[in-house]
Amino acid sequence: SLREALKPLARLEIEAKESFDAEGKQYEVDLIEAQARKDSLKTEMKKAASGTGKRSIEKIKDELLDLEEPNKPLMVRYKTNDATIEKLSELLNENPNGLLLFRDELVGLLASWEKPGRESDRAFFLESWNGDNSHTSDRIGRGTIFTENLCVSIFGGIQPGKLTSYLIPSMNGLENDGLIQRLQLLVFPDEIKNWELVDQVPDRNARERAYQIIERLAHMDFTKYGATEEDGERFPYLHFSDEAQTLFNEWLTDLEIEKLRVDDYSMILEHFGKYRSLMPSLALISHLIDVADGASGGPVSLQAAEKAAAFCDYLESHVRRVYGLVANIDQQAAAILA
């Protein structure tokens, strides 16, 4: 099930909550101490003002200005199941690496964007796709919320019939805002025809290995593994190795000439247009997984680029199947009427 894939994140969130609770107790003690120091200085200032103090008001003022309250701990978050865009903006301020929005049934999320008063939600998620945009929200009740790094991933499932009803309006140019094309890891698997009962003990070693990889990625300092930091750049970045760059150039040339210039369904072409960034993104993810599993750092490897290219080929067949639900909708309607 979908939830099985999220168990490592759930484990990380439990550990983050335990750490947050421990830091919260220390914060409360530190806050009491800071308040006591502040009260003591206030008392001393009153005495200085009345001429009975041992120190000058200026020295006490300097100490008050230098007095710092302890930083309130922030709980690390990795995912959410339901949040308004205002609350999501606040969570992203506290978790600038981004968040995963998980819904078992995505149709509920999509439908919520059509409700009166929630019209801006859809635009918010469209803007969050790049992963490096900033966002400013101004509300009378909440005031101004500035989110430096707008980065949200969406994960969930949807039934083909409900997906079709959502895709049909997107065929209209005015309603095709590119949201569906941004769901780049769309998969539409075959139904299992020859079902068999499989009753096996899970591979605990593999499960623990997967968790360790995800935990290392969550806390990884990428600059220690070959990422470059430059002035003016908000994020460190990695290059392809020479071999991987050659493969990417060949793959991109094939995409531009063989796939994007053919007479194909327009929404499919728009979807494939997003692959220009999908392939290197998948290569980077694959490379970092290898690094977290013990491989050496450095440029994104040829092996990671090959995996990414193969994954894009795999996803292409699923994309065609998804859009095939509505590609010939006019002919299907005519056949039904006939």
Residue ranges with predicted function:
Residues S1-A338:
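Phosphate-handling catalytic cores of nucleic-acid transaction enzymes
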